[in-house]
Structure formats: C-alpha cells, structure tokens
Amino acid sequence: MKKFYILSIVLCVSTSFFISCQQDIEIWDSATIDYSGRYVIKIINEKQEVIHHYDGKEVRIYNTSKNIENELWIDDVGKLLPLKSKFMLSGTPASFASSNQDFNQLTDNLHTIVAPPFDKSENKVPAPTKEGETISLDRPYLRATVIEGKIIPKVVKTKGGNTADSLYLKVKLFSGKATFKGVQKAKTEWKDPNVAEYEWVFENVSYDASKDETYVISGHSYTGFAEDQY
C-alpha cells in the first residue's frame, strides 16, 4: 500500500509538470481558443531580412473582454515592433486576415498612444501648462491590420526537438501623429498644493500613408520546456 501511495504522488507531480509546461495560459473558456496562446517569435521586414532573431521574445494572442469568435488581442509583450491592438478577423486559424484594412476602422495600438515621453526623442516634451492645451507628435505604428495569418498545429520542431504550433502573421503598420490634451492632475499629485499641475492624455490619431510598413511575425507556440529556451 505504501509503495502504491508513493507511486501515485510521483505520477500526479509528473502529470502536473507536463500540463504546466504545455498550458501556461489558461484559455479553456476562450471563444478564440484555436488562436490563443504564447508564441516565440522572430521578425522579418519587407526585404525578407530577419531584423529580430529568436531570443525568447513573445507575441501573445488572447480573447477580448467580449470573448467572441474572431475578435482578439495581438500583444507584442516584448515591444519589438511594438504592437498591442485589438483585431477583428475573418477566416479560420489556418487562414485569416483582418476583416477591415481601412485605417479609420482599425483600433489604436496601446503601446504607441501612451503619453509622452514615448521614447528618448520625446524626453524634452514639456508638460502642459493649462487645461485643454494640445500637442501632436510623430508616432510609429498607431494602428495595424493583419494582411495574412496562419496558425498550423503541431508542424514545427523546436530547437529542443519538441513539437509546436507554427505562427505566421503578415501585418501592415500605419504611422502618423498622435494628439494629446492637457488635463489637470488630481490635487493630491501637486508638488505645491497651491499650484495646479497638468498632464497629457491621449486624444486622437492622424494617418500618414507615406510611412506604412509591413512585417512578418513568424514563430511557434511556447512549450515551456527548458531545452526550448533561448
């Protein structure tokens, strides 16, 4: 009886370990389960040059709060492009694309509409001095569309020899200007309680077609196994 008890524990621990490696994100109730997951990626430009090789950086795909079919987030968590946008897709995981390619119908990229400074070039952008003051700044990749996408189960051999799903995303990125508006901070945030302070909040975007860029995000599903780590 004692031997059986010990064996049962070992089997349970081993099974739990295997499941935890393969299912790092719980997506069982997701309406987009056939898309959803963690994907280790590389990025290729329009000249077919690899501009970012595999190093463990990931894209994560998951359902929106509405949890409806073919509406999902694509989140470049390593901020390689960067990209974090909601996409409405048509098709199936084996062959899909954004249901709309029109800039005005696309959602904002949450990684690039943040208040300044967005990067070092904006370090000297002054804070607003009054309510309603506006500023427009050049920003990359304000919105994006999926031109072509494919997720194929169990066709990739990882660096460690394991089997994983393949990911192919050809995305078009739209750049332009992001406009921010000055709003008054909460009084508890003022350095001097008698002097009002203001901050920038996102207002809207405008599109510059001359700055369009297209990239391929290519990779495979994250396995969690040590031998597949970069």
Where are these regions (language model features)?
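Positively charged n-region of N-terminal signal peptides that target proteins for export
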Residues: 1-4
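Sec-dependent N-terminal signal peptides
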Residues: 6-14
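Alpha-helical interaction segments
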Residues: 11, 28-29
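C-terminal motif of bacterial Sec signal peptides marking the signal peptidase cleavage site
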Residues: 16-20
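Bacterial signal peptide processing site
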Residues: 21-25
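First exposed extracellular module after export/assembly in secreted or surface-exposed proteins
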Residues: 29-230
